[in-house]
Amino acid sequence: MSIDRQTLLSVAKSIRSGAKSIRAQISPIHPKGYPFVGGFALASIILFWIWTPLGWIGTLLTIWCALFFRNPARVTPVREGLVVSPADGRISMIAPVVPPAELELGEQPMVRISIFMSVFNCHVNRSPVAGKIERIVYRPGKFINAELDKASEDNERNSLVISTPNNGLVGVVQIAGLVARRIVTFVHDGQTLETGERFGLIRFGSRLDVFLPEGTQLLVSEGQTAIAGETVLADFQQADGGRTYRSN
C-alpha cells in the first residue's frame, strides 16, 4: 500500500502540532534545580543496581524533585495598582504588624500577607509589584516551622524593598522553613522589576511575606490558595475600606 506525499506531510504536521501541545503542558525545570534533579537521577540509577525496588523509589523522588523545581509560565495581570502573589501556596496569615527593622519601613504597622509554601508547591518567587529594588538584606537565623508567626522574626530570611512608581514602598521577605535551608535571589540593588517577574526561590518548603501600606484594599483572605504571578492580593487604586482580617 502506497502513501502519497500529501498524506505524509499531513501526518508530520499533526505530530509536530502534538509535540508542541505536550511541551506547552509540561513546565520546564528552573536551572537552579538541575544539580538536585541530576543528583536524584544518578542516585536512582545506582539504587537500581543495588535493588530494583529502591531504584523505583529513587525514580519517584526524582520526579518529585523535578516537579518541585518546575518553572511554569504565568499570565500576570498588569493593571496599575494591582499586587499579585509572589509565591504559590496557602495564605496562612493576614495581619497588621510592624515590618522587620532591616526593611527600614518605619515603626508603623503595615499589612502583612503571609503565604506558606509546602514541599509540593512551585517555589519560584515572583515580584508582587512593578518597581525598583531599593535594597536587599539577608539575615541568618533559625529554621523553625515557617507557618508560625515568630518565624518572621527568628528564621533565616532575605528581604527586598521595592519602590513602586505611584504607590510607595512594598516589602517582600523570603523566609526559610523547617526543610528549606537555602534562599536564592537572582536580582540586585537598583534593578527594575516588572509585576510577576521571577526574582528568586527557596528550596524545599518555606514562606513569603508581603508588606503593604495600611488601608490597602485586600482582595484575598486567610486559607485561600494563591498562584504566583496570577492571584491578585490587593489593589492600591481602591485604598478605602480594606477587608477585615479574619478567617472564613
Curated annotation (Swiss-Prot):
Pathway(s) where this gene product acts: Phospholipid metabolism; phosphatidylethanolamine biosynthesis; phosphatidylethanolamine from CDP-diacylglycerol: step 2/2
Top enzyme class: lyase
Cofactor field: pyruvate
Localization per Swiss-Prot or TrEMBL: Cell membrane
Note on cofactor: Binds 1 pyruvoyl group covalently per subunit.
GO CC, alphabetical: plasma membrane
Major location category of this protein: membrane
InterPro entries with a match to the protein in the record: PS_Dcarbxylase, PSD-A
Recorded catalytic activity of this chain's protein: a 1,2-diacyl-sn-glycero-3-phospho-L-serine + H(+) = a 1,2-diacyl-sn-glycero-3-phosphoethanolamine + CO2
Post-translation changes: Is synthesized initially as an inactive proenzyme. Formation of the active enzyme involves a self-maturation process in which the active site pyruvoyl group is generated from an internal serine residue via an autocatalytic post-translational modification. Two non-identical subunits are generated from the proenzyme in this reaction, and the pyruvate is formed at the N-terminus of the alpha chain, which is derived from the carboxyl end of the proenzyme.
Keyword Signal found: no
Function comment: Catalyzes the formation of phosphatidylethanolamine (PtdEtn) from phosphatidylserine (PtdSer).
Name assigned to this protein: Phosphatidylserine decarboxylase proenzyme
Source species of the chain: Nitrobacter hamburgensis (strain DSM 10229 / NCIMB 13809 / X14)
